[in-house]
Amino acid sequence: EHTVEITARGLYSNSGQGLHRFHDPVDGATYLYTHFEPSDARRAWPVMEQPDIKTRFSLEVRHPRGWTVMSNTRPQAGGSSPQAATGTECGCETTSFAASRPLPSYLTALAAGPWHRVTGQWTSPSRPGLTIPLSWSCRASLAEHLDAAELLDLTRAGLDLYDRAYAYGFPWDSYDSVIVPEYNLGAMENPGCVTFNEELYLFRGPVTRAQRAGRANTILHEMCHMWFGDLVTPTWWEDTWLKESFADHQGTWAEAEAAGYTEAWVSFASTRKAWAYLEDSRPATTHPIVARVDDVEAARQAFDGITYAKGAAVLKQLVAHVGQEAFFKASGLLFERRAYGNASLDDFLHVLSQVSGRDMHDWARAWLHTAGPSVITDELVVHEGRIASLTLQQEGSDPVSGWSVLRPHTLVVGLYSFDGDGALVRTHRLPVVLEAASLDVVEAVGLPAPDLVIVNDEDLTYAVVRPDETSLSCLTGSLGSLHDPMARSLAWSMLHNLVRDAVIDAALFVQAVLVHADDDTEPSTLTVLLNQALRVTCRYADPHTRSVFLERLVADDSTGPSTEGEPATVSGGWGRLRAAAPGSDAQIVRARAWLEAAGQARLLGEAGSAQVAARAREILDGALPGLELDADMRWRALTALARLDAVSANELEAQRKADPTASGITHHLQASSSMPHQDLKAEVFERLLSDTTLSNDHIDALVAGFAVDAHRELTASFTPRYLREIQGLWAGRGQEIATRLVVGLFPACGDEVDAQAVEDWLATHPDAPTALRRLVLKSLDDLRRALTARRTGSVVL
């Protein structure tokens, strides 16, 4: 046995990687926290960075007296001891932590500072004597915004649920949750010391139900990791799905079961799966769920929409295939056999096959080892008002291998018709199993002809669905009559996928959003739709249609001729906002979306821009009853005005002084860098390339200020410089910061000239790092997709 002692001095980080240091501008306090996944523990202490190298860690921290220090385990009894200061007037003390259970290095954690901390405890309902201390912490200057009672109650409810479902006791001796500033991710599952993104989950003003549900989802996602990922850790990063896909799936399930957000799977369908379909549609980013990962640089890019969202959607299909009871029983068996160790795909398949009585390896080969989505279409034949035949067809091509792929789909086909009140209601639910290239749904023959067929109703499987012509016509003309939240979410997903793939025109989608996305739409779905409508308008529409629909996104309601020649209301984004119920979630969602669209109004010319700026001023002046003007909403309005060159530097500075928080400083940086001036664009671009002192949040703010779609005429000239610099940026910055710069400064709303310049760079830089090339290819694919959509042929409706 050998002992190696290392004494070292390290650098604090401002990138969110390693040991990050933050100075609070409000009270001058300093806070530290770690983030190591996948391989940044080496930035703080010398370790072996492999997930299958697990050991017990013990930590001793010397820190200013009065600080609270948290780690993976409880502090040892009497573990805080005062020490004499060395060369200072203030004293220090040392906090010692008990040795942890076996952990890989990336899960070790430390959070230190004068935190505001609220404590509680949880007692297992099924294991007498198992009581775990709980806490929630945030910066002291934000103490008034910590919803401690709500968060502790949610934590207990989640632990109750997982305790019952997994039949394996909570495997750690404490559960601290720390909300931290300048965080790169949503959260991180360090056992016993979970960290959360302050900007996302510490609410400083009014928020929607969807935001609270999203916070609950993240909390329960990380809690699931205490078992999937922490207790049983993937052997290597190609099995990242064994923790992230599971946590994404289980977090959504628990959001509904423990937190009471019964719309959780609707939100999953409209948000998480949209991310999955986008990542899976790009040749540059699609990969099998179980992907080859050669090194830790590649591992960092494995945390994507395939590993998280597609993997979770496929797990939902797995549960539909084998049943929830078998899934949970297999999970508990895996925990028993691999506790505090590692596991691979084969380990999970073995226990699942054992419990379900089915050999799951063929299922896994079809779903986990192939890339790209299945595409399912339906062919409906009607005779004399009744269904003569209904045929489902699936096709799939793995972009990685080039092979044709057929997957087994356990799904539901929903038949919808208009009722007497004009609502689209489901008249028949047809469960089917599609395993071959086609399937005749014999149960449908003879049923009344539907107005709409929704393949994959209830969202049980993962597939891109192409509706038949009758259904597409129904969706574009009457989607607002579809009142079931899940069916409505799936219908919107179908339409957006059709636009993204240039099957239908951008105008059809934006028109549908303006007409049919009413205030009864589930808030998370409404948020997604309004964001998609703006993106489709700015990126996918040809220049003429872009101006027409951008004007509608920011305009008041107006009247125009209907098909019968009678006046009809033409919906506008401003009109929809003014009509939203005061204080409602819909009002908050529409105000945020309208201000984002308003920031692009330079595309409407001087007169149009001035009118939009005047309306943004109305919001700032409180002209919308019920809309609370918290700091966030004020900054949104001021940033929109800055993008329109309709606000002064003095006004922005006055708001910064009124909101002197870290968030306020970051918002001020974004707003002040958003003005449409050529010299300012050059200054911001140069600062992003050369200023290595910028924190991760401040880089994001400057990138957002620089890369405004409506300012493309001011930023187009920077593309050649961008392409000259990115390889040096990749080599000279940490991967987290470099990724933000490479993606954020890419000419995302460019033209054919930009696309060709990027292709030339790829051709002349074949030896550029694989991870860098992947990011460039990903952004190029999005640009090429947008250019194709612009050529589809817009028809202004």
Task: State what each model feature region is.
Residues E1-P25, P46, G87-E89, A437-A449:
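A surface-exposed beta-strand-loop module
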Residues T7-L11, R62-P64, S100, N197, ...:
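Solvent-exposed residues in well-ordered beta-strands and their adjoining turns
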Residues T34-S39, P46-L220, D248-T252, Y261, ...:
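Hydrophobic helix-coil surface modules that form long, contiguous segments used
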